Amino acid sequence: MVKLSAEDLNDYLNPGVACVKPVKVQKKQDNQQNIKVNGESYYEVTKDTGEVEELGIASISLNDCLACSGCITSAESVLINLQSYHEVLKFVNAKEADDFFILQMSPQARASLAAYYNLSVQEVQLWIQSVFTNELKFNVVVDTGFSREISLRQAAIEFCQSWVAANAAKTVYNSKSGEVAPKPLPVLSSSCPGWICYVEKTHSSLIPHISTVRSPQQVAGRLLKDWFSYQLGISRKKIWVLSLMPCFDKKLEASRNDFVNEQVRDVDCVITPKELVELLKTKNISPQSMDLDSLSISEQTPCLPSWYEPVQFEQQNGSSSGGYLHYIMTFAAKALFDINDLTNRINVSQKNADMIEYELTSPDTGETLLRMATCYGFRNIQNLVRNVGRKSAPRRGRVLLKRMKNMSTSPSTGTGKQKLDYVEVMACPGGCINGGGQLPPPESSADFSGISREWMRQVEAHYFQPGVRQVDNAAVDAAVEHWLPSYSLQQSILHTKYHAVQNDTENPVALANTW
């Protein structure tokens, strides 16, 4: 059993008081009202005939969490109970000969395991690959590096088209990837499911600002199921995709109905490094029990397309949350203003460790061309909301939307400071590298208490240890066109939609439970 506590998780959430997603009640006739209790079971007894029927157990699904406004994002305890490593073991034990199992691992989760076991990320990749292919019967183990490059590329194209539409200015930008529906500025990142749930449940007026690009997890899940289903000639139902991710809300993301194709989810199950360690303990598996030198990355990944890079150790420049801001800033500087060298062109303003602003200045006039920010942790997200208005939730959303529109389209203020064009938003303080599912320091590390900033920096050092890389835009475009030859397919599969969750304003418990 995985045990969680407030000090283990960032922004830890118990199920809300209003977490009472109603179970459908079947109306009974007057002669069917008696309830009989026997041990741990409950039975309904018909008065006239004496017929006994065992009552089912009421339960809450992940879809219920997505449709309920009782919690701000989700309750980690619910996520653990409904999608855990026990599910992995159940499917592994039930695997049939024609089933095809895939593990996709995020670089942040890999770095967490590397720091925890004092290994390099390369050694962790080899170890996890060996465990899952040899011990757990998985067919393929990949990371989400390549799918992240697809997401970054799509997000940059979306931003540039939105910026041009909002500014109605002539630039050197010429998109060869079709036209996407422009977003009002600032464009807000969408790879963090905790942030997305927060917007959908409490500030739905901001949905038009949210990037529609799928996260790397969902891009990879769809791509891998499509490819192996076609390549192996098997149904998507026979392909089971497991994700190893740094946060629990990724379980919710995988459960969204938007990510279902042919009644099959693109990602079937999500676990975190904490849960993986518990799984390995049940099988008495540790890195020390394996000869890592005898393993090779190239020994697996059968049938993968030649254009799909299964493992990327080098990371993109920028944040350890995927580098969205850095990539989009670099891409937009070239695409919009024909600026190739950003050296001495970026002014950085740090409000706190989790709120940093970046300004791109003109090499000729010194004026601000683009202004972007990273915003991590609900404290900063709440501050953003509080600075705009503190009325009712719908009112706050409308005021915030109006203010943000004015911010993005109005000329510079008297101080010459331009308003934000793009924000990389993550729910966890420190971003994805400090996700709630990441491992704490080993018990032998007495210098740390909980997940501290120092420990987070150590995990981040492992994340960037192999070095940095630039996205090969031409290779990514070629891969996308090979996989999705038409623009309509690209829009359908690489983008998604968001949905406002109706607040139960007539429920006094729900009203009292607002954040």
UniProtKB/Swiss-Prot annotation:
Residues annotated as binding [4Fe-4S] cluster 1: C19, C65, C68, C71
GO process annotations (BP): iron-sulfur cluster assembly
Keywords associated with the record: 4Fe-4S, Iron, Iron-sulfur, Metal-binding
Residues bound to [4Fe-4S] cluster 2: C192, C247, C428, C432
Gene Ontology CC annotation, any one: cytosolic [4Fe-4S] assembly targeting complex
4Fe-4S as UniProt keyword: yes
Gene3D superfamilies: 3.30.70.20, 3.40.50.1780, Fe-only Hydrogenase (Larger Subunit), Chain L, domain 3
Keyword Metal-binding applies: yes
GO molecular function terms attached to this record: 4 iron, 4 sulfur cluster binding; iron-sulfur cluster binding; metal ion binding
InterPro entries assigned: Cytosolic_Fe-S_CAF, Fe_hydrogenase, Fe_hydrogenase_lsu_C
Family affiliation: Belongs to the NARF family.
Role of this protein: Component of the cytosolic Fe/S protein assembly machinery. Required for maturation of extramitochondrial Fe/S proteins. May play a role in the transfer of pre-assembled Fe/S clusters to target apoproteins.
Protein name: Cytosolic Fe-S cluster assembly factor NAR1 homolog
